[in-house]
Amino acid sequence: MTPQEVITQARVLINDDNSLMPERFSDTEMLGFVNQAIKRAAMVRPDLFIISDDITPTVDQVEQELSTNVTRIMEVHRVVGGGAIGEVDKETMDRSAPNWTTETSGAPVNWMRHPRNPRRYFLYPAPSTGTEISVEYIEVPDDYAIGDTMGLADSYRSAIVDCVVYLAEAVDNESVDTERAKQFYTSFLQSLGADMTQRDVVDSESGKAEQRRGNNG
């Protein structure tokens, strides 16, 4: 699925396919709508944007931070070429081993979520030089060029098209149909599964990311 394919389908739905009159929106404007739609999809269904990667943490630092295009750390699995890294609660670690932040660097055996910043996490012990860790995180894609292949599965194409139509009609003051725009946005949400059966990535009171199902009340 490319932005161009999405734009072509969206133009038909907004009667902007250049068949009878000049296009109301340029390809650049439509591409902007596509990239906005992807970012909205990431907010509604962050689980569709989980990345598995091996990364090099900052040496000799217990507190780590992922890049700015990452919205949250999901899991720290293991040291690459080494053992598993188990998740523990930071408050529990602080109570049971008050000096854990000053211990000698080495291969991490535990990790903890930051209580207030989903992009940050802690490693125990602090990683030594040459350490790589296997992690999962949610990353919002950079803006796509019109011919790029998007990372979202093609089965979600109709959802992105619906959101592009919504965004186009919402800014077209001359011909906007508010109810029609709302219908396309509702279709976008439903196509993503953002209804009563949606599986959301949420935070528990402990700060740990979890998945749960919505209910009818």
Predicted regions and their residues:
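Glycine-enriched, solvent-exposed interface loops adjoining structured elements
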Residues: 1-217
